[in-house]
Amino acid sequence: VTGVQTCALPIYITVFGADTDTSPYDSGSYASSTTYITGKAVEKCALKLRSQICKLGAQLLDCSENDVEFDGKTVFASDDPSKSVSLGDIATASMFGHDIPLEVTETHMSPLSPPPYMVGAAEVEVDTETGEVKLLEFDACVDCGTPINPNLTRVQAEGGILQGIGMTLTENVTYDQRGWPMENSLMQYKIPTRVDVGRVRVEFENSYEPNGPFGAKSIGEVVINTPLPAISDAICNAIGTRFYELPITPEKIAMAVAETEGAVG
């Protein structure tokens, strides 16, 4: 999306997946750096490519680079739009007879990592006999700068929230006496499904991060980490006990309720 918006080439962009035979080395996607770091590199690369397109188009039009514009399909003279050359002809010309290739490389690093922000509110229903927790609704408001792709940003937030819910309530790894994990499939390692979660609402409070591509910040970790304290606080508000170990299972809740009632009795 960053490259498309920068170069104004929505129908001419094809993204190829990484290929270890040809792609540069990449240590991985982590630390909420994909959009913030890689996106900025893509923006710089697209700006440089756009400049190359205009420069070669100006040569073909026999005019100055400063006197042409690019609309995503053609390079044309600013004072005479009828004087133009198509992107296809520019690409063909770049193959021979000219020293301006339509191929660019850029890198980007940032000493800064501006934090995203998120507010989460959980509504739960706790069965004090069985300890079962039903998440009725989870509302979130996220500040990740300017969302590059609003639809994908919303889906990523919803997916991260689901991961956070699983981390809080169900996901756990235990080991037997041999040191082997007992949760060796999704039958034992339970992740939340759609029927386990009520309504999830995500809204965005847009800001502008000048160091990010188009004002974007990261979003990866904050949407996973926020459900934990929100759900934990909701359970504490319901039964009066705060938990300090994850996951907060029905067994732990039922035992906590029994201990509280026993102490009161």
Label for each model-derived stretch:
Residues 1-9:
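Short, small-residue-biased leader/transition segments that mark boundaries at the very start
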Residues 8-265:
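C-terminal catalytic domains of large/alpha subunits in multi-subunit enzymes
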